[in-house]
Curated annotation (Swiss-Prot):
Alphabetical list of PANTHER family matching this protein: QUEUINE TRNA-RIBOSYLTRANSFERASE (PTHR46499:SF1)
Species the sequence originates in: Clostridium botulinum (strain Hall / ATCC 3502 / NCTC 13319 / Type A)
SUPFAM superfamilies xrefs: tRNA-guanine transglycosylase
Active site annotation, chain numbering: 89 (proton acceptor), 271 (nucleophile)
GO MF: metal ion binding; tRNA-guanosine(34) queuine transglycosylase activity
Protein name: Queuine tRNA-ribosyltransferase
Gene of this entry: tgt
GO biological process: queuosine biosynthetic process; tRNA wobble guanine modification; tRNA-guanine transglycosylation
Required cofactor names: Zn(2+)
Organism domain of life: Bacteria
Residues that, per the record, bind substrate: 89-93, 143, 194, 221
Quaternary context: Homodimer. Within each dimer, one monomer is responsible for RNA recognition and catalysis, while the other monomer binds to the replacement base PreQ1.
Top-level class of the enzyme under EC nomenclature: transferase
Keyword DNA damage applies: no
Length: 376
C-alpha cells in the first residue's frame, strides 16, 4: 500500500508498505542481476550503505541457477540473505534485447538462450510462475519492449498485446498466491506502460491499465536511446493518468540528473546498472559530478573519492590508492568504487526525500544540477 506523505511541486514523498518492510520513496533500487551486485558487494554491504530495495532479473535467474533451485532454497530472500524488499523484473526486456532469434506470438515469446542457444518459451503465465518461485516482494508484468523508434502501427498492436498479457499476469498471480506451497503468497504486481515515444498511445495505455487496480505502475521502454527531452515529454504525458495512490516506477533510468528531473515530474521508483557498472571501470560520482580515477591527475591525490562522503571507501582510502589498485588490476578497486557509487545514489535519494519533506525540492534540484555541471 502506498501512502503519500508530502508533495513539493509534483515531487512526491511517500511510503510503500510491502510484506518485507516499508519503502521510503523516492527510492533507487540497487541492481543485482543474478541475486548479487557485480563488484564483490554482499547483502551485508547493501544494508550498511542504506539500500532499501534490491532488484534481480527473472530471465537470468531462470537460466542460472534456475528458479526451481531458488524455490527449493526458500526463495530469493533466504538464498541471498536479504530480508528487505526485492523486485524482480519480468524478463521481457532481456528476451527482446539479448535474444537475436525470437518469435512473438499471442501466447508469448519463443527465443534462444544467450548462454547456450537452447530454445525457450516465456509468456505471461511462465513469467509469473518463475517470479513466484523466486518469491520476490514485487513482480513485474510480462510486456513487449519495442525498439525505439518503431513504426506507429506496430507500437499500437504491441501495446494492445501487452495489455492482454497484463490481464493474464494478474490472473496467474492471483492463482499462484492462493496455492499452499507458494513461498510469498502476498507477492505484489506492477503493470508496465508502453507506447514508444507516441504520447497519445502512452496516455491511452496509462488510462487502460490504471483501471486494473494493481499494486504499482511502471513506465517502461525509455532510456533506450531516445533523447532526454523525449523521456521527460513522455513522463509528463503519462504520470497524470496513473493513480495518485500507487507508486510510479521509471524503469532503467539512473543518470543522477535524469532522476532529479523525473522526481520533479512525480516518479517514485528508479533502478539502473549505472552506479555498479561505472564503479567497476573507475568512474565514480561526486558532489561535483562524475570523475575517472584512472586519469593521471589523481596519481598523487590524497583526498577521498568525494570529500565528506561517509561510504567505506571514502572513510578509509585515497584517490591515489584506489587508482593504484585499478592499475594493478586488484579486485578491491572495483569493490570500493561500486560501494561508493551505490552509497552516493542511496544518499542522493535520502537528500531528495528530505528536500520534499522540507518543501525545497525545486531549489535542491537546481543547486545539484549546477554543482554537477552536466557531469552527472
Amino acid at each position: 500500500m502506498y501512502k503519500l506523505l508530502k508533495k513539493s511541486g509534483k515531487a512526491r514523498r511517500g511510503e510503500f508498505t510491502t510484506p518485507h518492510g516499508v519503502i521510503q520513496t523516492p527510492v533507487f533500487m540497487n541492481v543485482g542481476t543474478l541475486a548479487a551486485i557485480k563488484g564483490a558487494v554482499s547483502s551485508m554491504d547493501l544494508k550498511e550503505i542504506g539500500c532499501q530495495v534490491e532488484l534481480s532479473n527473472t530471465y537470468h535467474l531462470h537460466l542460472r541457477p534456475g528458479d526451481e533451485v531458488v524455490k527449493k532454497m526458500g526463495g530469493l530472500h533466504k538464498f541471498m540473505n536479504w530480508d528487505r524488499p526485492i523486485l524482480t523484473d519480468s524478463g521481457g526486456f532481456q528476451v527482446f534485447s539479448l535474444s537475436k532469434i525470437r518469435k512473438i506470438q499471442e501466447e508469448g515469446v519463443y527465443f534462444n538462450s544467450h548462454i547456450d542457444g537452447r530454445k525457450i518459451f516465456m509468456g505471461p503465465e511462465e513469467s509469473m510462475r518463475i517470479q513466484s518461485n523466486l518469491a520476490s516482494t514485487i513482480a513485474m508484468a510480462f510486456d513487449e519492449c519495442v525498439e525505439n523508434p518503431a513504426p506507429r502501427e506496430y507500437v499500437e498492436k504491441s501495446v494492445e498485446r501487452t495489455t492482454r498479457w497484463l490481464h493474464r499476469c494478474k490472473d496467474e498471480m492471483n492463482r499462484l498466491n492462493s496455492l499452499p506451497d507458494t513461498i510469498n503468497n502476498k507477492q505484489m504486481l506492477f503493470g508496465i506502460n508502453q507506447g514508444g515515444t507516441y504520447e497519445d498511445i502512452r496516455i491511452e495505455h496509462a488510462k487502460t491499465i490504471a483501471k486494473m487496480d494493481l499494486d504499482g505502475y511502471a513506465i517502461g521502454g525509455l532510456a533506450v536511446g531516445e533523447s532526454h527531452e523525449d523521456m521527460y515529454r513522455i513522463i509528463d504525458a503519462v504520470v497524470p493518468h496513473l493513480p495518485e495512490d500507487k507508486p510510479i516506477y521509471l524503469m532503467g533510468v539512473g543518470i543522477p540528473s535524469n532522476i532529479l528531473e523525473a522526481v520533479d515530474r512525480g516518479v517514485d521508483f528508479f533502478d539502473c546498472v549505472l552506479p555498479a557498472r561505472n564503479g567497476r571501470h573507475a568512474h565514480v560520482f561526486t558532489k561535483e559530478g562524475k570523475i575517472n580515477l584512472l586519469n593521471a591527475k589523481f596519481e598523487l591525490d590524497d583526498r577521498p573519492i568525494d570529500e565528506g562522503c561517509q561510504c567505506p571507501a571514502c572513510k578509509h582510502y585515497t584517490r591515489s590508492y584506489i587508482r593504484h589498485l585499478f592499475k594493478a588490476k586488484e579486485m578491491l578497486a572495483m569493490r570500493l568504487c561500486v560501494l561508493h557509487n551505490l552509497y552516493f545514489y542511496n544518499n542522493l535519494m535520502e537528500e531528495i526525500r528530505d528536500a520534499i519533506d522540507g518543501n525545497y525540492f525545486k531549489e535542491y534540484k537546481e543547486r545539484k544540477l549546477k554543482e554537477w555541471g552536466g557531469r552527472a
